[in-house]
Amino acid sequence: MPVTAYVLIQTEVGKAQVAKQVGPINGVTSAENLTGPSDVIVPAEARSIDDLGRMVVSQIQLTEGITATVTCPVVNL
């Protein structure tokens, strides 16, 4: 069953281009700059929670300028 999540990203000061850098990653559906405690929000989809974790760790977190991420999987209650 596919997994959807929102990845909240904190960046270094002056790194507004992070949203443009993560946008093309396979599984990322969009990337938007924010104000507040997070700098970028990234809705993402993957085939499984494990695939989602691999995408976040091996692709999103390795993007230059990212200092922290929080991944919030969507749940159906």
Regions found by a protein language model. Name each.
Residues 1-77:
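A compositional/biophysical signature of low hydrophobicity enriched in polar/charged and small residues
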